[in-house]
């Protein structure tokens, strides 16, 4: 047996022995009739205590004689004869307990407390004080075991070192990793901030179907499921767009939705098969209005959630305080590939030659617009580090966007980039029912030619447009990628509580 295998076997034996001992302790609690009490109530969390009392001097705390009740997980314990110090962790952070034998009911210290294990969940009552080193602590007069942990904490509280284990057992990651807990607290604040921002501007939050007969609103491969009662194949939605615009037709002029989308595609540091999007639609507005709204949203969130418009990310610092850069797609190609002749981007054969010269395989179904977009993706996207809006997307790759009045080959559309990745996509909506019907037909033809990400024909949506969609602009923002930026996270798995994982064999 190799040394590594032997070490692994020893760890399994140690774990089994420890779990056996813990189960025996639980059995003893069951015999006493109180294995999982549910009558303990706390009145403060650790962060509340630190916020209110950290600044007070020891003498002031003693004079105030403040009794508190806390509960949480025992993370560390130092037993020093007749007294011990415990680190208790709750949702707000950590607080130190001072546990003295003579200050507890008879038998609690030796017969109960000293037999408890790290990871157990405790309830404690006592008086606030400060230690000689100035640490806010609770001098316990009551201590109870609320939940017996049958498994030990990971690596004796040194944290999870295995990235895979962090994602598969997120509960252990959250117990042992402050950074991970803070990431998801920040995510929650971002979502709350978005909702506050939108409602303040007159938007109504709505919910639209997650299972759809016709998947639409984006170019992507859908997941397929089956409805037994209807004997009908259905699709997990790839986007809520077409349903949200139906609501605008119905008279809800400002709507937004924050929810999951599903795309049956690859997994990477930036892609998860299910992900969170925020989509909004705003009647009597165009894409330029949404550029302003997007810039304001990110600046507001940075200031409100992080307290600054200077957001660090790896070696970069994103500046949300200054005006965001704006480039057309062709301008971006020229900026980051200066040798490009702009005239070549207006001709199919010339653009194809440019694409092939930089290693792009041009599919037979591609038109000029798709080729130019692929060139942009290859030469420019990775360089868009600071917040940047890219405009003038080709109509070929924008089947739901309104054509530009001056040049019908492009659309009134933008994508928003930060850190070399797309974060948002918005455009003036196509509200010409006949044009939309033709673009759906073009997508059907592309699908027949082998493009499995092309859209389906949605007859009911065309019918809705025939009733009249006001001039409208729409925007979609990837929440997971936004959270990555605001938390300095470099893989999407770090900002999704339970990311998609291959099953353990």
Swiss-Prot record:
EC number in record? 6.1.1.6
Q: What is its main location?
A: cytoplasm
> What cofactors are annotated for this protein?
Mg(2+)
Membrane-crossing residue ranges in chain numbering? none
Tell me what this protein is called: Lysine--tRNA ligase
Which family does the similarity line name?
Belongs to the class-II aminoacyl-tRNA synthetase family.
- Binding site residues for Mg(2+) 2: 422
- Cofactor, free-text remark: Binds 3 Mg(2+) ions per subunit.
Q: Which GO BP terms sit in this record?
A: lysyl-tRNA aminoacylation
Offer one Pfam family short name for this entry: tRNA_anti-codon
Per the record, what are the reactions this protein catalyses?
tRNA(Lys) + L-lysine + ATP = L-lysyl-tRNA(Lys) + AMP + diphosphate
Q: Which organism is it from?
A: Salmonella paratyphi C (strain RKS4594)
Name any one GO molecular function. Answer: lysine-tRNA ligase activity
Q: What keywords would UniProt list here?
A: Aminoacyl-tRNA synthetase, ATP-binding, Cytoplasm, Ligase, Magnesium, Metal-binding, Nucleotide-binding, Protein biosynthesis
**What are the GO cellular component annotations?**
cytosol
Per UniProt, Mg(2+) 1 binds at 415, 422
Q: Where in the cell is it found?
A: Cytoplasm
InterPro entries with a match to the protein in the record:
Aa-tRNA-synt_II, aa-tRNA-synth_II, aa-tRNA-synth_II/BPL/LPL, Lys-tRNA-ligase_II, Lys-tRNA-ligase_II_bac/euk, Lys-tRNA-ligase_II_N, Lys-tRNA-synth_II_C, NA-bd_OB-fold
The annotated subunit structure for this chain is: Homodimer.
């Amino acid at each position: 047996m190799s040394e590594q295998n032997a070490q692994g076997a020893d760890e399994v034996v140690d774990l089994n022995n420890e779990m056996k001992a813990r189960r025996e302790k639980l059995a003893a609690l069951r015999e006493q009739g109180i294995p999982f009490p549910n009558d303990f109530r706390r009145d403060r969390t650790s962060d509340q205590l630190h916020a209110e009392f950290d600044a007070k001097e020891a003498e002031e705390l003693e004079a105030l004689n403040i009794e508190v009740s806390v509960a949480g997980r025992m993370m560390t314990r130092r037993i020093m004869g007749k007294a011990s110090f415990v680190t208790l962790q709750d949702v707000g952070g950590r607080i130190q307990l001072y546990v003295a034998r003579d200050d507890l009911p008879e038998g609690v210290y030796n017969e109960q407390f000293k037999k408890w294990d790290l990871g157990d969940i405790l309830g404690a009552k006592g008086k606030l004080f400060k230690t000689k080193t100035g640490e806010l602590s609770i001098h316990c007069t009551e201590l109870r075991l609320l939940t017996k942990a049958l498994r030990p904490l990971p690596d004796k509280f040194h944290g999870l070192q295995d990235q895979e284990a962090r994602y598969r057992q997120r509960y252990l990651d959250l117990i042992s990793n402050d950074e991970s807990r803070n990431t998801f607290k920040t995510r929650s604040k971002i979502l709350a901030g978005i909702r506050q921002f939108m409602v303040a501007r007159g938007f109504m939050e709505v919910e639209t179907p997650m299972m759809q007969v016709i998947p639409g609103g984006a170019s992507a491969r859908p997941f397929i499921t089956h409805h037994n009662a209807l004997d009908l194949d259905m699709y997990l939605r790839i986007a809520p767009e077409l349903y949200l615009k139906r609501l605008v037709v119905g008279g809800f002029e400002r709507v937004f939705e924050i929810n999951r989308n599903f795309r049956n595609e690859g997994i990477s540091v930036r892609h998860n098969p299910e992900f969170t999007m925020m989509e909004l639609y705003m009647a009597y507005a165009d894409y330029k209005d949404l550029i302003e709204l997007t810039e304001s949203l990110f600046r507001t969130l940075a200031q409100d959630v992080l307290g600054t418009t200077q957001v660090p990310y790896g070696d970069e610092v994103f500046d949300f305080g200054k005006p965001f850069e704006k480039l057309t797609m062709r301008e971006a190609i020229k900026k980051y590939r200066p040798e490009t002749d702009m005239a070549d981007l207006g001709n199919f054969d010339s653009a194809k030659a440019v694409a092939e010269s930089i290693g792009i395989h041009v599919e037979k179904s591609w038109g000029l617009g798709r080729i130019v977009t692929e060139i942009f993706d290859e030469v420019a996207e990775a360089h868009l580090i600071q917040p940047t809006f890219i405009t003038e997307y080709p109509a070929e790759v924008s089947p739901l966007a309104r054509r530009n009045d001056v040049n019908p080959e492009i659309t009134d559309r933008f994508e928003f980039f930060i850190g070399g990745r797309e974060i948002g996509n918005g455009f003036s909506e196509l509200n010409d029912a006949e044009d939309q019907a033709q673009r759906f037909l073009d997508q059907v033809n592309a699908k027949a030619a082998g493009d499995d990400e092309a859209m389906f024909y949605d007859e009911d949506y065309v019918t809705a447009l025939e009733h009249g969609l006001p001039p409208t602009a729409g925007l979609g923002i990837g929440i997971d990628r936004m959270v990555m930026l605001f938390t300095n996270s470099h893989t999407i798995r770090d900002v999704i509580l339970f990311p998609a994982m291959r099953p353990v064999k």
